[in-house]
């Protein structure tokens, strides 16, 4: 799998890219106003524990505050997970988000690929279960 990252307007120019979590309409007025207010705090380092966000989400969703992991995007969290788990063998359906493979390679994890098929809508089929051997200790599944 070739490494690429979505949202690369510097290579491909302006485009609507659904592979990244970016609003093609741009930020809302509420977000722009919040960003302006945040500029007043730009001399201070952000709260690396995200205490206010953690507290509000836990309260709203009625779950324990320890249930959250925050990062600067999905890719950072994937790398954090892979570095923490230090998996030895992964099962990775392809085609898929390239960051899964890249993160696994950073820890020298052996990757066993499961090729999905176009004629099956790139869905995982029953034969996937045959690939689930005891030595596989991490799997990435996505839609």
Region roles according to the model:
Residues 46, 58-80:
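Short loop-beta-helix segment that forms the pyridoxal 5′-phosphate
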Residues 84-104:
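Conserved PLP-anchoring active-site segment centered on the Schiff-base-forming lysine
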């Amino acid at each position: 799998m070739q490494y690429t990252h979505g949202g690369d307007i510097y290579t491909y120019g302006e485009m609507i890219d659904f592979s990244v979590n970016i609003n093609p309409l741009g930020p809302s007025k509420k977000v722009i106003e919040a960003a302006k207010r945040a500029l007043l705090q730009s001399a201070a380092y952000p709260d690396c524990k995200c205490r206010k966000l953690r507290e509000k989400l836990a309260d709203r969703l009625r779950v324990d505050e320890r249930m959250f992991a925050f990062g600067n995007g999905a890719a950072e969290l994937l790398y954090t997970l892979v570095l923490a788990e230090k998996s030895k063998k992964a099962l990775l359906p392809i085609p898929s988000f390239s960051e899964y493979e890249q993160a696994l390679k950073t820890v020298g994890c052996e990757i066993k690929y499961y090729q999905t098929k176009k004629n099956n809508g790139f869905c995982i089929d029953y034969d996937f279960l045959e690939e689930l051997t005891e030595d596989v200790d991490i799997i990435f599944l996505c839609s």
